[in-house]
Regions:
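Strongly charged
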Residues: 1-132
């Protein structure tokens, strides 16, 4: 986790909202959303179970993270904007945006942390044997 408590709190807010299936708009960045992927058959005897995955789009979708900060921190929009700006400055690196405990955005591709994938998919990804 980050050494900055404010950054940790915003990261946790993002994780909680995504785990709940919400879409989040990150102003100046784009939107994160959870996609449900269906089961797929590997062969006659095995199926990969359905899963949830975080995806990214440059379009504005869902609730603004600033509005979520207003609700969570019980503050006004101006203060929430300031928190968001400081958070964004702390998580943006060279061509990446890293949300500790959630994942990393490189270009237009979001890669979830393995631990967060298990939050979204507590039963894992191992193929399931089909009984007849």
């Amino acid at each position: 986790m980050s050494a900055n408590p404010m950054t940790e709190q915003v990261n946790r807010l993002i994780a909680n909202r995504l785990a709940a299936g919400c879409e989040l708009f990150l102003p100046g960045v784009g939107s994160l959303y959870v996609e449900q992927r269906g089961a797929r058959r590997l062969d006659d005897e095995r199926v990969v179970p359905p899963c949830r995955a975080v995806n990214f789009t440059t379009q504005e979708q869902g609730v603004s993270l600033i509005d979520e900060i207003v609700r969570a921190a019980h503050c006004d929009h101006e203060k929430a904007q300031s928190i968001y700006d400081r958070w964004l400055d702390s998580v943006v690196g060279e061509r990446t945006l890293t949300i500790s405990g959630v994942g990393e955005l490189k270009g237009n591709r979001f890669n979830s942390d393995p631990e967060f994938e298990m939050v979204l998919n507590p039963y894992g990804f191992d193929p399931v044997r089909i009984r007849e």
